[in-house]
Amino acid sequence: MAAQGEAVEEIICEFDDDLVSELSTLLRVDALSVLKRQQEEDHKTRMKMKKGFNSQMRSEAKRLKTFETYDKFRSWTPQEMAAAGFYHTGVKLGVQCFCCSLILFSTRLRKLPIENHKKLRPECEFLLGKDVGNIGKYDIRVKSPEKMLRGDKARYHEEEARLESFEDWPFYAHGTSPRVLSAAGFVFTGKRDTVQCFSCGGCLGNWEEGDDPWKEHAKWFPKCEFLQSKKSPEEITQYVQSYEGFLHVTGEHFVNSWVRRELPMVSAYCNDSVFANEELRMDTFKDWPHESPGAVEALVKAGLFYTGKRDIVQCFSCGGCMEKWAEGDNPIEDHTKFFPNCVFLQTLKSSAEVIPALQSHCALPEAMETTSESNHDDAAAVHSTVVDVSPSEAQELEPASSLVSVLCRDQDHSEAQGRGCASSGTYLPSTDLGQSEAQWLQEARSLSEQLRDTYTKATFRHMNLPEVYSSLGTDHLLSCDVSIISKHISQPVQGSLTIPEVFSNLNSVMCVEGEAGSGKTTFLKRIAFLWASGCCPLLYRFQLVFYLSLSSITPGQELAKIICAQLLGAGGCISEVCLSSIIQQLQHQVLFLLDDYSGLASLPQALHTLITKNYLSRTCLLIAVHTNKVRGIRPYLDTSLEIKEFPFYNTVSVLRKLFSHDIMRVRKFINYFGFHEELQGIHKTPLFVAAVCTDWFKNPSDQPFQDVALFKAYMQYLSLKHKGAAKPLQATVSSCGQLALTGLFSSCFEFNSDNLAEAGVDEDEELTTCLMSKFTAQRLRPVYRFLGPLFQEFLAAVRLTELLSSDRQEDQDLGLYYLRQINSPLKAMSIYHTFLKYVSSHPSSKAAPTVVSHLLQLVDEKESLENMSENEDYMKLHPEALLWIECLRGLWQLSPESFSLFISENLLRICLNFAHESNTVAACSPVILQFLRGRTLDLKVLSLQYFWDHPETLLLLKSIKISLNGNNWVQRIDFSLIEKSFEKVQPPTIDQDYAIAFQPINEVQKNLSEKKHIIKKYEDMKHQIPLNISTGYWKLSPKPYKIPKLEVQVTNTGPADQALLQVLMEVFSASQSIEFRLSDSSGFLESIRPALELSKASVTKCSMSRLELSREDQKLLLTLPTLQSLEVSETNQLPDQLFHNLHKFLGLKELCVRLDSKPDVLSVLPGEFPNLHHMEKLSIRTSTESDLSKLVKLIQNSPNLHVFHLKCNFLSNCEPLMTVLASCKKLREIEFSGRCFEAMTFVNILPNFVFLKILNLRDQQFPDKETSEKFAQALGSLRNLEKLFVPTGDGIHQVAKLIVRQCLQLPCLRVLVFAETLDDDSVLEIAKGATRGGFQKLENLDLTLNHKITEEGYRNFFQVLDNLPNLKNLDISRHIPECIQIQAITVKALGQCVSRLPSLTRLGMLSWLLDEEDIKVINDVKERHPQSKRLTVHWRWVVPFSPVIQK
């Protein structure tokens, strides 16, 4: 066996073409590349993992236990994997076969684990049915006694003789030493790993590593003479008391079981179904409507069992259903025809010796007659598959991995058929019975037979659900293993239990608690069925099992009559006296399963006594009780079992079985919850899953929101179930909704009795339990919760809609009060996004206009935008919302325009959907139209139905934006340039404490490289989502109204494909004007030439950055007759053809040329500009210019010039330029970058620009005091100035205080950049001026590189600075050679200063050397600051060197 696992590890492909196709379609990614990359990573992990036969995982129950921490968001259940031989390795999500060592990391929706196992390792000996020691999950240690020792008993008195019998001891049991076994009195029987005591004859098997043969011997056969001769009574007692599980149980209880079946060895294809047992399949045909024993045998041989409906049969392995059987039909052939992938069939057919025997039973006898009225005339209708069998017909079908699930046990076919085949040492009822004893035994055996007959009927397994739900097969829906935790009453520690562990620990009085619909009833019925089937050895110890529903009994009823009425049916009868005698005799061998418990007071006396005085009867009781009813019964319990939330993999398992014909819908369902991880817990009970299935049956088309559909279906279920109490139900929903709504807006999810009373919720009302849960454990007062936080939101949405729709003004006011708690777009799009989705899913003609109006107003209210930073406990409601909040906040900080666009689209979509669903579009139109006026929206909104109904609203919009982002990702940061900029900088010498102020550039580069790799992987796999122009406005033909302005933004995109070109042609033709902004998208323009040529008269703006303009591109641009704005920046080559023909753009208003590295850019402009009279913005960035004449002429021709930017390191003669600029009285912005003019010539004309708003002279130097004073005086005339970048130089330093005083007279100033020239006195002047009321609108104060300011000067500045309510950015950074080491008192002053700046979001302080204590002070200030969520402190340099640490 070891060699099998040690084979050279091949690369395992866990996916197939179907999966690749499905994922590519649904996720719009290149799934093949993603899956191949995952396959490579999995292979590397697989190579490192241990291989070989794992004897410790032979036990299916142990394998099942390994899945306790397994990810619940998977397609396979732990039961399916454990049954297929897999256990969870703990390495990622890897599962491994205990036998062949196959390791799988992925689960597949279309294939079960046994199918994948067989496909990838068909030679696995476990799959081939060989004896590899597999122990079924319900199997037991005790085996049937063997006869072989009777003649050799004397010989085996000698230990050596016993040891010799172990010569062929199986390899998988080597963890238990033959020498220890023989010393304990055991002899190897030669069958699997079964041993038998030579003295008492007791047989034990399923030995695992660590087992103690003496302990096992003492537990199961404590009266053995050999055992008693070797061990003292105290030792035996200690063995028994320390044994885990099986309290009060010995081997006698299993050996003498009345329900015991002879079970074959477990096979992998059994698929966790009891009907893998032929005998049990045969039993299901008791009510078969046809008369032919031979036909039944053929059906059974083909793996089929009878469902109890018409003549529908189902395969225990694949779950396939067939019906309408006729004479001569061949079950095995039809089974193969309709379900060719059935693992059971494949396994049978792989064994040549099976086929002849199988075929001899294939054909149904010709003489088969029917006792039903089924019509078999239509040959084509014979054997409908499960798709063709109506759900109501298939409701009792037992699925392949059903709740009624059990594997065939590891028993040999040749085990003794009789129950009394043991030696004289075994424990059998005495044959010398008195008459009264014989009477009770006879009655008990008869009762056992009747109970087994009742429990094995399909009608017992099936649960009736109301009306529309009755179309569902509850065996499918409620059949998966529930998740159970055990809570011992005397111990607070909780532990997860598998179902086998639960069965092993059944004793005394226990309860199983859970929510409504959690599966309590089905769990009890499952136990009863498994016991009756005889296929669950763990339950063999019970001779009688009584499943009783307590909902229909009265306190005065006798227990015997209850049993007769509920379980024995017509003709069944047992007296109270006889029942009492049986219980008294059997004691621990009687199990009561009590369902629908509501309280001790409602119980008959007999049951009351069984519970409260269990020490008298010593029976076992398992009581199903709703969570809120546990307190009353807790004093009598030994252990409480609690059913936890229904795992998501169980939900998938149910849907896969019921909707195997529509597997893509199931795939979409999984993807929806994969993308919405916060929703994965909403299927918390099987009843919720039933609601999903009902909705799917009623609505075959996909639902946009799976959670909304689920909650609505659940509420519909409640209304159907409680039709007779419609008004009380409505009142309960309203009061619970009020509680939910109040809790939602106070972040409260746990409530006490006072909260319920205040909301009008009756905590004792049964209907309340359908919506809320009560928790009493370890609490002085009970705590109430809704069935889930999302369900609370849903009920809150129902209540809000009810309030806003009310005729009562106070209700409407209350609803509006709650609605206004959503007072910012951030809240609307993050923590309350799901809530608003639920609100919009409840159409209301009265509520819709109110909700729509409120939400649309949020977009533009500046006050509400400021509310985004308030401190709220977001995590309580939606932990996943925190990241979303940060992303939205970051978007708002980086680009308020993009933020507004995003929330506008999303809130508009919610509002329009609400208005349409509630049929209130007309009522909502005034506020919708007001919202649309002057708005820029994304192209996607035009696909909404509203724009098809009202295309005229396009005229109200400012523009529509379309963004195309491709995969041509470009590195934005050039680290070589950064390193070059530090070439002349000497590393500073600092103390070790301050070394953290410098971060090595290689760390940043490495980190960025890793992120780039991740981004690149994502971009490579991502498919561009095609633009959808098939709905809404785009369905109109012809288009009655056009898009007023189309903004096209193209980033990192290559040439457009044919599909995109067709879309753009359609969109361009529907636009009045078009503006382009292209970056890093070479080749794109040429590729959309056909679209541009059709709409060239509409293109008004073209901005191109970091792309290569070919000759063809330039020619194409020159054909745009109405171009008004042209921008070219950061191109490698000079587009001379385009620039030389600028005069052809007759309407050009804006020209921006940003080619910093190119000299003499102006030289390629045309010589004359006779047609350019409309220029409003002129921005030129070049390295040097030797001739300004063309620029001067262009300005002369531009009487409406508003913006002038010029960056140039050298100008040969600037006098003409200054002269012509002086004539431009309408200038709003002037920026000179680079030291490109004589200062005085500009200062002389500065007073002319009275409308100036932006003046940027940061790169200019004013060396003399006279020029600087004149500049300061000129500032006083610029009353509209908003942004000032003060020049540098010694002259400016000398008059700095004068400049500050002049700036204080500028009422509109928002940005002040004053670098390099301030000292202690002048910087203090800024602080004093602000404190006196100046700079009230200042948002950005940049004081960088002012190295003349001392630490004392800074400290005085910090201590005085105040009264700047709008300041957002303060920068006091210095150059590296001028690092400043400050004292604690200065840090304290800085902290106090920051605290006085309520709007501050950025503090720049590079080259300020801070130690850990300083940083702690700064961080403490940040945490207490009003902008704590947004405030960023920049204090670390990123440098290509390490500082010198002084010793």
Swiss-Prot record:
Residues 508-802 form the NACHT domain. Zn(2+) binds at residues 315, 318, 335, 342. Transmembrane segments: none annotated. GO terms for cellular component: IPAF inflammasome complex. ATP binds at residue 520. Keywords: Apoptosis, ATP-binding, Immunity, Inflammatory response, Innate immunity, Metal-binding, Nucleotide-binding, Repeat, Zinc. GO terms for molecular function: ATP binding; cysteine-type endopeptidase inhibitor activity involved in apoptotic process; metal ion binding. The keyword Metal-binding applies. GO terms for biological process: apoptotic process; cellular response to estrogen stimulus; defense response to bacterium; detection of bacterium; inflammatory response; innate immune response; negative regulation of apoptotic process; pyroptotic inflammatory response. BIR repeats lie at residues 60-127, 159-227, 278-345. InterPro entries: BIR_rpt (IPR001370), LRR_dom_sf (IPR032675), NACHT_NTPase (IPR007111), Naip (IPR028789), Nlrc4-like_WHD (IPR053882), NLRC4_HD (IPR040535), P-loop_NTPase (IPR027417). Component of the NLRC4 inflammasome, at least composed of NLRC4, caspase-1 (CASP1) and some NAIP protein. Interacts with S.typhimurium (Salmonella) PrgJ and B.thailandensis BsaK. Sensor component of the NLRC4 inflammasome that specifically recognizes and binds type III secretion system (T3SS) rod proteins such as S.typhimurium (Salmonella) PrgJ and B.thailandensis BsaK from pathogenic bacteria. Association of pathogenic bacteria proteins drives in turn drive assembly and activation of the NLRC4 inflammasome, promoting caspase-1 activation, cytokine production and macrophage pyroptosis. The NLRC4 inflammasome is activated as part of the innate immune response to a range of intracellular bacteria. This is Baculoviral IAP repeat-containing protein 1b.
